[in-house]
Amino acid sequence: MKALVIGGGGFVGPYLVRHLTDDCGYEVTVTKTEKEQLVMDNAVVKNLDILDIGQIVGLLKAEQPDYIFHLAAQSSVAYSWKNPTLTIDVNIKGCVNLLDAVRQLDKKPRVLLIGSGEEYGHIKEGECPIVEDNTVRPGNIYAATKACQNMLGKIYSDAYGLDIMMVRAFNHIGPNQTPMFVVADFCKQVADIEKGRQEPVIYVGNLSAKRDFTDVRDVVNA
């Protein structure tokens, strides 16, 4: 079986590729942006601009994958406030480009779209634990783009009969995560304090927020 991992240069990509090759025995191709540095000895790595539908169509026709894992995203909530246009372009336009490219294929692969627990937004009292059909109330730009991606997946599935699966994954943690994310940031601060690079104070944001965290290796296994 052939798998195509779109946007494999981030945190989750290497873990997913390792699972697909070592545990599933798949032949894997991974895409990255031109600026990203990504070397893998267990997969073929190719450059792809998710905003260029012509590139996507060409890649899909050449690879003829059985499965597509769409990881390409601007995935920082904080950065989505700083650059909403880029977040919307990558997360929404990029998703539309992929789905429209899949629609043009004779061989229709199964597509996995990665949503976010952020889509649920502000949870009301009595709604926990959250279930899949809980009301979606995006509270930030990143969450809104992921909710839109979810709706686009359903629309393309219903209208064109595409085999699309969607998940709303909650916060991932694990080795090699960048300090852009909260747990990795806390860990980096602790390490810097131990090495004398930072005063013995951990700087935090809103500690009243409640989140579920899942090890990235458990996420890709699921």
Segments and roles (model prediction):
Residues 25-34:
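Conserved glycine-rich Rossmann-like NAD(P)H-binding loop of the short-chain dehydrogenase/reductase
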Residues 3-23:
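N-terminal Rossmann NAD(P)H-binding glycine-rich loop of SDR-like oxidoreductase domains
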Residues 42-52:
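Rossmann-fold cofactor-recognition segment
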Residues 6, 31, 68-72, 111-117, ...:
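SDR active-site strand-loop-helix element
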Residues 50-90:
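NAD(P)H-binding glycine-rich loop region in Rossmannoid oxidoreductase-like domains
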Residues 82-97, 109-110, 118-166, 173:
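Catalytic helix-loop patch of NAD(P)-dependent Rossmann-fold dehydrogenases
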Residues 55, 96-100, 218-221:
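Conserved mid-core alpha-helix of short-chain dehydrogenase/reductase
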Residues 123-129, 151-212, 216-221:
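NAD(P)-dependent short-chain dehydrogenase/reductase
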